[in-house]
Each structure stands twice: as C-alpha cells, then as structure tokens.
A protein has these predicted regions:
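N-terminal low-complexity, intrinsically disordered "leader/linker" segments enriched in small/polar
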Residues: 1-60
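Short, surface-exposed beta-strand/strand-loop-strand elements in extracellular ectodomains
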Residues: 64-85
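Extracellular or exported targeting regions of proteins
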Residues: 51, 60-64, 80-82, 102
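Noncatalytic modules at the cell exterior or secretory-pathway interfaces
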Residues: 97-124
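C-terminal interaction-tip segments
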Residues: 1-15, 115-135
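An anionic, turn-rich surface loop/hairpin at beta-sheet edges
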Residues: 78-100
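Extended, low-complexity, turn-rich repeat/linker tracts enriched in Gly/Pro/Ser/Thr and Asp/Glu
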Residues: 60-69, 118-120
Length: 135
C-alpha cells in the first residue's frame, strides 16, 4: 500500500503558480518525492519562455502527526522549508520577494518533499504560492 497523495494546481499564470499538496499516510511516508516540476509549469504566454525555477512566496499548511521537509532539488538537495509536526500556519514571504533557491551543483529548480515521523492516519495539507522564474 502507499500513502494517499494528491497534487492539485490551483493557479498557473505567467508570474505565480499555486499548488495544493495533500497526504494521508498509511505509515510509509514520502522520501524526496518531486512535488513541483518547474518544467511542467505553464510557459510564459507572452513569449513562450519555459519556467526554470521558483521562489517560495507563501506557504499555508497544516500537519497532523508528521513533519515535512520541502527540498530544493540538486545533486545534494538543500532545505527550502521545514514544516513542524502537528502545526498550522500561514507564512508570507512576498514582502521581500520570496525564499530563494539555495541549491548548488545540479540545481533543477524543482521542489521535493520528505515526511518524517509518519504513522498510519497522519496527514498534511500544504498550499504553496510560487513566484516563477524564466531565466
């Protein structure tokens, strides 16, 4: 059996993408699973440029029984944001342009997710507002 997970794109415009992630765990959890594939985001409608990366503009989340790590994908993944277990919050980073991707060698622009401390019945709901980059 596997965790019951969903990834739902709420908005995917020229500048902003909003994605909802959910998980109801069967106890297996997730390990470095790609949740945001920037190459799959909509291209810029004005010039056709493909999205090459994102900044984390805002995160709204609720976790029950497990913690979650969002990771910037690279040869050696780096932490984008830690989501505490049994916690609900709304963090807005748009006032300073968003959380930058700090990955080094092999940087893809994608965001991965890993759960820790998961047991059967634990869950998360995460809504990410992403600021798209076309460089």
């Amino acid at each position: 059996m596997a965790d019951a997970v969903t990834t739902t794109t709420i908005q995917d415009g020229n500048r902003i993408a909003v994605v909802q992630l959910t998980n109801t765990s069967d106890g297996n959890g997730e390990s470095a699973v790609t949740k945001i594939d920037v190459s799959a985001l909509a291209p810029n409608s004005a010039n056709g440029q493909v999205c090459t990366g994102v900044k984390l503009g805002r995160i709204v989340y609720s976790t029950f029984g497990m913690s979650v790590k969002l990771l910037w994908d690279a040869t050696t993944d780096t932490i984008c944001w830690d989501l505490n277990s049994d916690y609900t919050t709304d963090e807005d980073f748009t006032g300073f342009g968003g959380i930058q991707n700090t990955a080094g060698n092999g940087k893809t622009g994608d965001i991965k997710l890993t759960t820790t401390g998961h047991s059967s019945g634990d869950s998360y709901v995460i809504v990410l507002t992403l600021i798209k980059d076309y460089s």
